[in-house]
Regions:
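P-loop NTPase motor domains
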Residues: 1-227
């Protein structure tokens, strides 16, 4: 039986096919981030960021590339700076004790937590420096590159940055991406199926999440052949 990962617009198709796959010995998961009853398996894209400093930046940049492709040359300046900002804020979240490692938290921190974003982030960098546990050079450099822009330019960068992450301000999506109940790296090695359910009315809102899910699924399963 083939492993699958597929999007489904309506639940009855899951009900029909998932039972058959379970009977054939597969583990079956339903990722339904907009479910009204919040019954969903969870998928956290940040769980695939390595803890190794040598690999961490590349993993973050791979997510940033999926979020901010910048296919239009006219938008390249904004998308490249949005990726740089994503790199910096993601490192900030990962390196700050006690913060959830989620895309929702990245959006919250990049929104300033009630302060202008520059004041909030630079203030946190200074606090850590003064306390003797500074953020990594990669984090500080990425944030400084973006936050040193003029106010108008910074506003444009942040607007581009926010566009890709606004769906994660939805509490249901934030919860559904707060941890992982399945491992995309296991799709080629284990007998498993992942159904990604999105209601037709949410397809536009979920576009970024769908793209990121399948981008990670492809990249993580083509790094090496399954054993």
């Amino acid at each position: 039986m083939f492993r699958i990962a597929s999007t489904i617009p309506i639940l009855w198709s899951f009900d029909i096919t998932s039972g058959f796959r379970k009977a054939c010995g597969q583990d079956v998961y339903l990722f339904s981030p907009y479910a009204d009853d919040e019954k969903t398996h969870r998928y956290n894209p940040l769980d695939y960021i390595s803890s190794s400093p040598a690999e961490r930046l590349g993993d973050i940049d791979a997510i940033g590339q999926a979020l901010y492709s910048g296919e239009n040359n006219n938008d390249k300046f904004w998308s490249e700076n949005a990726k740089d900002f994503f790199r910096g804020v993601t490192l900030f979240v990962l390196e700050t004790p006690g913060l959830p490692h989620t895309l929702g938290e990245i959006l919250r921190q990049a929104s300033g937590k009630g302060k202008p974003v520059k004041e909030h982030l630079l203030g946190k960098l200074k606090e850590a420096q003064d306390a003797g546990h500074p953020y990594s050079n990669n984090c500080v450099d990425a944030l400084n590159r973006v936050l040193s822009n003029s106010d108008n330019t910074l506003a444009g960068i942040i607007a581009t940055f926010n566009t890709a992450l606004l769906s994660f301000q939805n509490p249901k999506v934030d919860l559904a991406t707060s941890a992982s109940d399945f491992d995309l790296r296991e799709v080629r090695r284990r007998r498993m199926s992942i159904y990604f359910k999105i209601e037709p009315t949410k397809l536009k809102d979920a576009r970024v999440l769908i793209n990121l899910f399948f981008d990670q699924l492809l990249n993580l399963n083509t790094r090496k052949l399954p054993s």
